[in-house]
């Protein structure tokens, strides 16, 4: 007999290298308690995009089976993420007249609708409309509902993605007998699990380095200002090792994970690494410092492209909290140090937060997306609870706009 839970939420991260399913229970105080976890190799994606539906479905099913067994439950709905070089981010602005000189939730919904009324091509899908600021009669405000005014403006960040990429993710999930409760942008999910409110307020750039893509999200004033997806990440580091050392790709991945270092000056020149040969060629030994010499140029290229994306945001000079690295490829020694050399800002490695009795498996940077998906689910539950308590009066306008948007699109 399946175990009974009061309120389960499920995060599904369909990555280029792995599929991760995490099941958690939202407890009475609004905290998350881990209930189940499943991880399986992923073989149906390339650079974050589904390229083989059958292989992706099999990977999801394998991770799902593990998670359901551990949680002793049947999963029906999931929060899942999306990334890829097809992702486009932009800022927009809308303005409406306030009907009764006092801003209502309807006015907020109208101004956000005006701000999101941009022209997008038929092959693109709206993925995110996130409010940045509201302005009443020229005055910036955080919470406009209830305030007096004649003109209400909204500044929002909009993200679109390829319609087919989103449809293929949803198709894979549905073929596993699941429904997508929400499709969330991967870097936004990661930011929910690894960034603090203070960092977002003071200015921070999140850099999620996975296997297929490097996702960037820039925050200032507590709001998202810029998003970018760079199609260069851990897989190309592995490819560089395989080609430079003439070793099979699987062995190159193992060498990267076990002995890799992103900064050559930090690598031990006396430490030797065994490099298997191709075909019937025997293995040979290589110093860890020489290995780092292969890795560093690619990591430097990734960080240079990230730096360019941050410059494009127009926020580089006000990122007081610096850079936060997360994702599976961020754990390599030397990443933080090389990042500080290139960004000339403080850099830290971001670990997922927000769950009591956090398992070691989900407290690592590679779990940033899936834990962020759970945090988004938790926040949705908390918002819904507050709405019911207030008899429909929404206390926080950001949550209200998000709930309104999800309900209409």
What is each of the regions a protein language model found here?
Residues 1-18, 22-206, 223-224, 234, ...:
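Nucleotide/phosphate-binding catalytic cleft detector across ATP-hydrolyzing
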């Amino acid at each position: 007999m399946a175990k009974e839970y009061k309120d389960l939420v499920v995060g599904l991260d369909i990555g280029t290298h792995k599929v991760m399913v995490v099941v958690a229970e939202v407890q009475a105080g609004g905290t998350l308690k881990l209930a189940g976890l499943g991880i399986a190799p992923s073989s149906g994606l390339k650079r974050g995009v589904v390229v083989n539906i059958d292989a992706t479905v099999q990977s999801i099913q394998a991770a799902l089976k593990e998670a359901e067994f551990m949680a002793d439950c049947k999963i029906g709905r999931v929060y899942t993420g999306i990334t890829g070089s097809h992702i486009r981010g932009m800022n927009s602005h809308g303005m409406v007249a306030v009907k009764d000189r006092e801003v209502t939730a309807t006015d907020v919904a109208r101004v956000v609708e005006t701000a999101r009324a941009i022209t997008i091509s038929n092959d693109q899908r709206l993925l995110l409309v996130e409010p940045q600021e509201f302005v009443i009669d020229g005055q910036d405000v955080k919470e406009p509902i209830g305030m007096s005014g004649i003109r209400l403006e909204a500044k929002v960040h909009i993200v679109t993605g390829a319609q087919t990429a989103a449809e293929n993710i949803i198709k894979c999930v549905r073929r596993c007998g699941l429904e997508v409760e929400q499709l969330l942008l991967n870097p936004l999910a990661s930011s929910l699990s690894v960034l603090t409110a203070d960092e977002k307020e003071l200015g921070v750039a999140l850099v999620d380095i996975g296997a297929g893509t490097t996702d960037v999200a820039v925050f200032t004033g507590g709001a998202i200002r810029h998003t970018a997806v760079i199609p260069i990440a851990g897989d190309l580091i592995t490819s560089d090792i395989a080609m430079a050392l003439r070793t099979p790709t699987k062995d190159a991945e193992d060498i990267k994970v076990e002995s890799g270092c992103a900064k050559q000056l930090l690598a031990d020149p006396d430490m030797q690494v065994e490099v298997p040969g191709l075909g019937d060629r025997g293995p040979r030994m290589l110093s860890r410092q020489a290995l780092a010499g292969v890795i560093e140029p690619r990591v430097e290229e990734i960080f240079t492209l990230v730096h360019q994306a941050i410059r494009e945001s127009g926020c580089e000079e006000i990122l007081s909290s610096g850079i936060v690295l997360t994702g599976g490829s961020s754990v390599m020694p030397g990443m933080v140090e090389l990042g500080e050399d290139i960004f000339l800002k403080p850099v830290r490695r971001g670990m997922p937060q927000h769950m009591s009795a956090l398992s070691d498996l989900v407290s690592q940077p590679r779990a940033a997306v899936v834990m962020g998906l759970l945090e988004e689910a938790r926040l949705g539950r908390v918002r819904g609870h507050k709405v019911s308590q207030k008899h429909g009066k929404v206390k926080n306008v950001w949550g209200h706009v998000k709930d309104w948007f999800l309900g209409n699109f």
